[in-house]
Regions:
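PAPS-dependent sulfotransferase catalytic domain
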Residues: 1-151
Length: 151
């Protein structure tokens, strides 16, 4: 089962992953930002055995749950970082209750996050950043409304 570590970009997700990684996995008390066992989902690797066009949002989203089903075959709890929301594209969802054990939702003070969104998404000013943040047609973590964040 998957526990999602979900947040806006620049909200402390990496810090929380380092903390959880140290708590759950790393007994050496050494923190290595380049060796965090809690990784991003989705990665292109997750879809490597599927013959799909990763740039086609419908093909991609219709296979997210297929990939999560494979990840969950051993029934162990896994934590994945994501900037994607619990959303649908057509009749397909990013995830579902069968694959999800829970969510850790990192929330940052909105007075700080608008600055991060402005810089992260290269918005010209705070008004443009606010418009981007409140646009229901935008997919968090994407540069356009037709793509989601895939690493």
């Amino acid at each position: 089962m998957i526990v999602w570590l979900a947040s806006y970009p620049k909200s402390g997700n990496t810090w929380v992953r380092l903390f959880l990684n140290s708590l759950l996995n790393d007994k050496t008390n050494e923190v290595d930002i380049n060796n965090i066992q809690i990784r991003q989902f989705p990665l292109r690797y997750d879809f490597s055995n599927l013959n799909i066009n990763m740039d086609n949002i419908q093909e991609f989203i219709s296979n997210c749950i297929v990939c999560q089903d494979k990840i969950n075959l051993d029934n162990s709890i896994k934590i994945f970082k994501t900037h994607n929301a619990f959303w649908k594209a057509g009749n397909n969802q990013f995830t579902n209750e069968e694959n999800t054990k829970g969510v850790i939702h990192i929330v940052r003070d909105p007075r700080n996050i608008i600055t991060s969104v402005k810089n992260h998404f290269s918005r010209k000013n705070y008004d443009e950043a606010l418009k981007f943040m409140t646009d229901e047609k935008k997919s968090l973590g994407s540069r356009t409304k037709k793509k989601i964040q895939i690493c």
